[in-house]
Amino acid sequence: MGRVIFHIDLNAFYASCEELRHPEYKGKPLAIGSKDRRSVLSTANYEARKKGVHSAMPVYQALSLCPELILIEGDFNYYRALSARFFSCLKKYTFKIEPASIDECYMDVTEIIKQYKRPLDLAFQIQQSVLNETGLSVSIGVAPNRFLAKMASDMRKPAGITVLRISELETKLWPLDISLMYGIGKKTVPELKKIGIQTIGDFASAENETKILQLMKNSGYALIQKARGHSSSQLHYSYTQKSCSVSKTYSSNIYTLKEAFDKVKELSIELSNRLKKDNQKGKLISISLRDLNFHTIVRSQSLNQYTNQPQIIYEIATNLIESNFESNGYRYMALTMASLQNANQIVDQISFLLFL
């Protein structure tokens, strides 16, 4: 059996994060960016994309295409907290994960997929687990290597799962427009089309190789091999944790601050114990609450010093809850520590600074 690689991508990540805490925006065109008309957008949700709005587009142009566009300035601490929850969720399955960015990664599931009767069951389980724990949807590409997994995850968005086998390149990959090939820049696309390369299949064709290499020089060869299905399946992953999470779904609703504080005390102790077991300390604490209508709020706070102490975690978490609590009845709570570092390294750094 060859390798099985998942590419997992959070759909319209920043925009989806904002829809989580502003459910009234769901179904409406929304983009992340400054309200300064001369600035550019970071991202846009799928409703905005249907209107022609996309990332890196100037705000004035986006508003001319979509006057009803909702503009929100980015809250990157909030996005990082949700990203940490996403990666913590995935690490329950395997540590063989290579982050590609804040909202996507590659996962080598070659070994763990053998535990499932049907290979796609693992993909469905991960998709549902991420949704349950973060409120965010993911698309998953399943393939024997990194490039094909990345291409597969882009084929069905949002919330799709796509398998791309080597035997399916001719029917699934090669008919796609060359502009959709990962690794081909926007400026290169028109140059390729000038020499007759319209599709990924044209790019993979042996008869076009010479003229592609004349245009793209050395970079063209590796991309041609990828289009033919030949790409590395080796991931560059580290067993170093970036975050640690604990969560619980409760059988009875949480309506009062006292109840919430009691629950978060239990989670603070559990999180502290996990951090101490792994000899980790962190500097970014986030709390997530989900109500009966599946509306999720996530709040985070950065610390001045690394910690794994339950009383500090509890104090920060209760402050975050108190300033954002609504008595709507919460069923789910999660507590995350991110920006982790080995506790011994922190001691070494302090000792070094004292020596200076």
What are these regions (language model features)?
Residues M1-Q214, G220-Y221, A343-Q345, S351-L356:
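Gly/Gly-Pro- and Ser/Thr-rich, intrinsically disordered tail segments characteristic of DNA damage-repair
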Residues H7, L180, T188-Y332, S339-F355:
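DNA-contacting surface of Y-family translesion DNA polymerases
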Residues E104, Y332-A334:
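Extracellular/lumenal ectodomain signal focusing on beta-strand-rich modules
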